[in-house]
Amino acid sequence: VYWINEESEIMRLVIGISGASGVWLGYKLLQILKSYTDIETHLVITEGAIKNFALETTLDIAEVLKLADFSYANNNLGALIASGSFTTDGMVIVPCSMKTLAGIVHGYAENLLLRSADVCLKEHRKVVLVPREMPLGKIHLQNLVKAAELNCVIIPPLLTFYNQDITVEQQINHILGKILMQFGLNYEK
């Protein structure tokens, strides 16, 4: 009964950071979510993402982990978020590697990140994917279509020009705002 969250005023979100380039997006999302007192975050970081944090940032992985309320090893298939009985409001995978995308759409729940997405899908919870690959091949596109057919929300981290945001930070904030909107959250940049 501890797992059920239906009466709670707290939003529970699972955040997955996979091994695609762009792990900074996941870090920034966690920073924003940390500022909300009514959001509980559950974090899974893949081994590839840990490598990318070392390659792409100067952050120590401990700095990333401390932003989440709970963090889990990717091989921990006994974690709370691996069970449909543990109620969440959904999941964001940012960035989402093509390997992770393929695992999700083909039900290959070999690790906690994939299992958590699988649970959210089977329980009809929102799954937001932020795929990071360029150019996209036919297999990538087919997998993205399949993800959309499974009701995943696809938010590619694309450059936008209509809002005159020209710095990288402004572009990142715009993408994060789009992610947060999926959960009814406003982000004041």
Predicted regions and their residues:
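Short, Lys/Arg-enriched N-terminal segments with co-localized hydrophobic residues
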Residues: 1-10
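A cross-family phosphate/adenosyl-ligand binding-site feature
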Residues: 11-128, 134-189
